[in-house]
């Protein structure tokens, strides 16, 4: 099976060819939005982090933002920061350059003399980058180049018996063609983790699947919380789901039946192809964000009661 895509120099294949206007901190998000609104062919993302945070959270922010830039749906990147943030715009741009040969430029609002001057410079840079991106044509690519994130949200009683098994069948077909799929939301494995773990390609992967579920419950317990107080959600209950076990047993169907080749931390880049699992929160926005940062170029999203969740960089197919 073949499809038309944008072949990158690192061998990855995108289904879009965006120029990304990327804030390095919350303070620059609005400026990035203004720039993207003025240049056709660009996309921006909104973040509320990037400064005044602990080391682990700062590292997570850097991993997500770098992952967005490295995604095969992105041709090039215009980074904008404030100039005094923890995740510095120059450092972020340098990190992207070290990991990729995509065109990257960066601007600091304080250094350039304010948002208006920064936006003007960024618009000029983005227009030049879009012009270069327009010269790249789609080429015929193999199905083994597909990287599909699989998500569910707003689930109801039909999700586990209809849409999720249907998408699971799709996941198996992509696997058989040599492509890659990724499933996340660890809390929605709980109660069915023993079933999912049987798909582990090795005993180590089996144990990793069990461990991420146990770690999630322990993390909540340290704060005196239980995931069962938030799962199923009110939306799920109205739709007919009564317990976390019922929800999880339906949830894992969307990942298919093929062996799981790797378990990844949140927003990490995979080292293997095949069926992957990413350890993320059970929140659509976080999980889709993390999987796209991990490299997924398409998101297939099942929903029973409906949800508008999408993503700026990857098409989300409901």
Question: Can you describe what each PLM-predicted range is?
Answer:
Residues 1-151, 155-298, 302-318:
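Metallocofactor- and cofactor-centric catalytic cores in central/energy metabolism, strongly enriched
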């Amino acid at each position: 099976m073949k499809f038309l895509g944008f072949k990158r120099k690192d061998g990855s294949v995108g289904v879009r060819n965006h120029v990304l206007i990327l804030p390095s901190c919350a303070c620059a998000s609005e400026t990035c939005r203004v720039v993207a609104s003025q240049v056709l062919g660009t996309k921006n993302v909104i973040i509320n982090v990037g400064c005044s945070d602990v080391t682990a959270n700062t590292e997570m922010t850097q991993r997500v933002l770098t992952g967005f830039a490295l995604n095969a749906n992105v041709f090039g990147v215009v980074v904008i920061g404030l100039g005094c943030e923890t995740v510095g715009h120059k450092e972020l741009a340098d990190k992207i350059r070290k990991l990729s040969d995509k065109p990257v430029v960066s601007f600091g609002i304080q250094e350039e003399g304010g948002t208006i001057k920064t936006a003007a410079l960024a618009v000029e840079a983005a227009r030049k980058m879009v012009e270069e991106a327009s010269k790249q044509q789609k080429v015929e690519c193999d199905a083994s180049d597909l990287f599909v994130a699989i998500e569910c949200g707003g689930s109801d009683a039909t999700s586990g018996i209809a849409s999720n098994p249907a998408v699971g069948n799709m996941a198996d077909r992509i696997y058989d063609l040599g492509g890659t799929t990724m499933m996340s939301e660890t809390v929605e494995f709980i109660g069915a983790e023993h079933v999912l773990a049987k798909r582990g390609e090795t005993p180590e992967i089996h144990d990793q699947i069990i461990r991420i579920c146990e770690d999630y419950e322990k993390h909540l317990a340290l704060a005196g919380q239980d995931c069962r107080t938030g799962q199923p959600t009110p939306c799920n209950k109205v739709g007919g789901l009564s317990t976390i076990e019922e929800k999880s047993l339906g949830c894992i169907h969307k990942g298919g039946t093929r062996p799981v080749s790797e378990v990844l931390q949140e927003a990490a880049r995979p080292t293997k192809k095949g069926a992957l699992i990413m350890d993320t929160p059970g929140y659509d926005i976080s999980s889709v964000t993390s999987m796209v940062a991990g490299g997924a170029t398409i998101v297939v999203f099942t929903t029973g009661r409906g949800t508008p969740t999408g993503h700026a960089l990857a098409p989300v197919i409901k």
